From Swiss-Prot:
<dbReference type="GO" id="GO:0005576">
    <property type="term" value="C:extracellular region"/>
</dbReference>
<feature type="disulfide bond">
    <location>
        <begin position="238"/>
        <end position="259"/>
    </location>
</feature>
<feature type="signal peptide">
    <location>
        <begin position="1"/>
        <end position="22"/>
    </location>
</feature>
<dbReference type="InterPro" id="IPR036857">
    <property type="entry name" value="Thyroglobulin_1_sf"/>
</dbReference>
<keyword id="KW-0732">Signal</keyword>
<dbReference type="InterPro" id="IPR009030">
    <property type="entry name" value="Growth_fac_rcpt_cys_sf"/>
</dbReference>
<dbReference type="GO" id="GO:0048640">
    <property type="term" value="P:negative regulation of developmental growth"/>
</dbReference>
<dbReference type="InterPro" id="IPR017891">
    <property type="entry name" value="Insulin_GF-bd_Cys-rich_CS"/>
</dbReference>
<dbReference type="GO" id="GO:0001525">
    <property type="term" value="P:angiogenesis"/>
</dbReference>
<dbReference type="GO" id="GO:0008285">
    <property type="term" value="P:negative regulation of cell population proliferation"/>
</dbReference>
<feature type="disulfide bond">
    <location>
        <begin position="39"/>
        <end position="58"/>
    </location>
</feature>
<dbReference type="Pfam" id="PF00086">
    <property type="entry name" value="Thyroglobulin_1"/>
</dbReference>
<comment type="subunit">
    <text>Interacts equally well with igf1 and igf2.</text>
</comment>
<dbReference type="GO" id="GO:0031995">
    <property type="term" value="F:insulin-like growth factor II binding"/>
</dbReference>
<dbReference type="InterPro" id="IPR022321">
    <property type="entry name" value="IGFBP_1-6_chordata"/>
</dbReference>
<feature type="short sequence motif" description="Cell attachment site">
    <location>
        <begin position="254"/>
        <end position="256"/>
    </location>
</feature>
<feature type="disulfide bond">
    <location>
        <begin position="69"/>
        <end position="82"/>
    </location>
</feature>
Length: 276
């Protein structure tokens, strides 16, 4: 799983976790011939070659229809987008974990409608020129707080009736979040508070963020990477899957550090805290 964060998804996260904003557009820096020449050669045959996620310049194989996709994976092929499961309660978490699926683009906007389209839990792939656009979300109506209050009151009444009739609440409580998931939530909260000026976001604010790469169990993936910056691949390193701390013997490189070779019993034991 590649650990390069898509700027397009970062901005999509802002629209999910922040207030309604107007349409935001920014361009990645252009790729020079020198930077492209420094990219490693592809060792596999690709149905379609695209730029790596984020603002990187190196070529990667695009994901095909039905293949898994997400924040840390190559983008989907032309005509496809990365979607979470339709019934998912946490679509963003699925995309961060790379558990989305590449599917055909679905245009849900009615023809000739002036209403803005609501954002779904999809990864919007940047174009090859580096342009990323995030559709606006519909602002809440004036009576939204009242509706929300009524819904909460209805739920409380229903819960009281269920207790009176000694019926258990069918919804099981959420399991305690892991350290990686807690760190992820903190980063998403920071993203939602980024200030946007003139409908453009300062890329430096996005570059400075590190979104932890969590696996489906909530643990840290062995390989963690920073965003691609100015066409250069982000630095990658290996971490303890339980604590997220760097493995002392692993390197910090712009590429795949092959983290499995640095694993030993100590890193796999959650009770052992590695040295700083």
């Amino acid at each position: 799983m590649l650990s390069y964060v898509s700027c397009g998804l970062l901005l999509a996260l802002v629209t999910f976790h922040g207030t309604a904003r107007s349409e935001m557009v920014f361009r990645c820096p252009s790729c020079t011939a020198e930077r492209q020449a420094a990219c490693p050669m592809l060792t596999e045959t690709c149905g379609e070659i695209v730029r790596e996620p984020g603002c990187g310049c190196c070529p990667v194989c695009a994901r095909q229809e039905g293949e898994q996709c997400g924040v840390y994976t190559p983008r989907c092929s032309s005509g496809l987008r990365c979607y979470p499961k339709p019934d998912s309660e946490l679509p963003l978490e699925l995309l961060v974990q790379g558990l989305g699926r590449c599917g055909r683009k679905v245009d849900t906007e009615p023809t000739g409608s002036a209403e803005p389209r609501e954002v779904s839990g999809e990864v919007q792939d940047p174009l090859d020129i580096g342009l990323t656009e995030v559709p606006p979300i519909r602002k809440p109506t004036k009576d939204s707080p009242w509706k929300e209050s009524a819904v909460l009151q209805h739920r409380q009444q229903l819960k009281s009736k269920m207790k009176y009739h000694k019926v258990e609440d069918p919804k099981a409580p959420h399991a305690k979040q892991s350290q990686c998931q807690q760190e992820l939530d903190q980063v998403l909260e920071r993203i939602s508070k980024i200030t946007f000026k003139d409908n453009r976001t300062p890329l430096e604010d996005l570059y400075s963020l590190h979104i932890p790469n969590c696996d489906k169990r909530g643990q840290y993936n062995l390989k963690q990477c920073k965003m691609s910056v100015n066409g250069y691949r982000g630095e990658c390193w290996c971490v303890n899957p339980h604590t997220g701390r760097p493995m002392p013997t692993s390197p910090l490189i712009r590429g795949d550090p092959n983290c499995n070779q640095y694993l030993d019993g100590q890193e796999m034991d959650p009770s052992v805290d590695p040295p700083n």
